[in-house]
């Protein structure tokens, strides 16, 4: 039975609060759709929080004590040069440089893609790959960490990836994006619900991780989340004023460079790039800095709080506003298509609450120096 389209899902909210939140989301999504309708062919049909990206946990502020604790440890003085390096997932050096962040030709104006501004970035390191299921499992086995999706007991999953048995047990959906369903038992170990597993995809990106979960992992690994500026600088791979990490053409010489949606969304994904869901983290050619799947495949968290108002004067290692409600995510996912979610461009951006999770949301880490043993 198809799930009725409700404006919001929150099994943990009082009934009165839920009604109010439903009304608020309906108003917000309607406004977002009206704004985006006039942004041209490249614009998505829904705001990031309503359809293109990942549904948000409504007003939830899940326990982030572990993430904050790990963050404090990560900000402690680093090890001195010469100490033995940890065995860690591959990181690549990102050289210092100046680049144009954002764009003066925004495709989704309300996302705050504009204006173009010159930004200087110090040298740092970036994970060559999105954090995989295998890498995240090492973290969980070492620490006993429970993700917020596991604590809440559910997470959002794209309907097209669900079994019929799981769908029959779902009574609610997101009105603005009915292909997003809240699935009990969906988490990083069970990306499509309790009858799914990651055993056959250890090298795929870990999914259903909140911003707090990502911070906890990166800090445990001696790393951190990249800033939005670092992420976008890395995405461009040394190229200037280009849409994608490899240039301006989506498929140069007919070759696929990213895992995105082909076909009519959300009805048919033809999988012309070889995948209908996520791909292994080393799929597709790397960009000029050696980064794989920096766009498409899975959305990636950054450390910045969300804002659509950018200072053109903050030109050295910008870190975004000091506070906010949502965190910035970049890169788009396997669900993105130009007709609906043209957010697999380096300048594109979206947002989610720090405790939100879904079946297209992952991350990769950055570091000022390569992690070392204590």
Swiss-Prot record:
Pathway: Protein modification; sulfatase oxidation. GO terms for biological process: glycosphingolipid catabolic process; post-translational protein modification; protein oxidation. The keyword Calcium applies. Glycans are attached at residue 141. GO terms for cellular component: endoplasmic reticulum; endoplasmic reticulum lumen; membrane. The keyword Kinase does not apply. Changing residue 349 to W: In MSD; loss of activity; decreases its specific enzyme activity to less than 1%; does not affect localization of the protein in the endoplasmic reticulum of MSD fibroblasts; protein stability is severely decreased. It is an enzyme of class 1 (oxidoreductase). Residues 61-84 are annotated as: Disordered. Keywords: Calcium, Copper, Disease variant, Disulfide bond, Endoplasmic reticulum, Glycoprotein, Ichthyosis, Leukodystrophy, Metachromatic leukodystrophy, Metal-binding, Mucopolysaccharidosis, Oxidoreductase, Signal. Cu(2+) binds at residues 336, 341. Coiled coil: none annotated. Residues 1-33 form the signal peptide. GO terms for molecular function: cupric ion binding; formylglycine-generating oxidase activity; identical protein binding; oxidoreductase activity. Residues 341-360 are annotated as: Interaction with sulfatases. Its EC number is 1.8.3.7. Ca(2+) 1 binds at residues 259-260, 273, 275. It is linked to Multiple sulfatase deficiency: A clinically and biochemically heterogeneous disorder caused by the simultaneous impairment of all sulfatases, due to defective post-translational modification and activation. It combines features of individual sulfatase deficiencies such as metachromatic leukodystrophy, mucopolysaccharidosis, chondrodysplasia punctata, hydrocephalus, ichthyosis, neurologic deterioration and developmental delay. Monomer, homodimer and heterodimer with SUMF2. PANTHER family: FORMYLGLYCINE-GENERATING ENZYME (PTHR23150:SF19), SULFATASE MODIFYING FACTOR 1, 2 (PTHR23150). This is Formylglycine-generating enzyme. It comes from Homo sapiens (Human). The lineage of its organism: Eukaryota, Metazoa, Chordata, Craniata, Vertebrata.
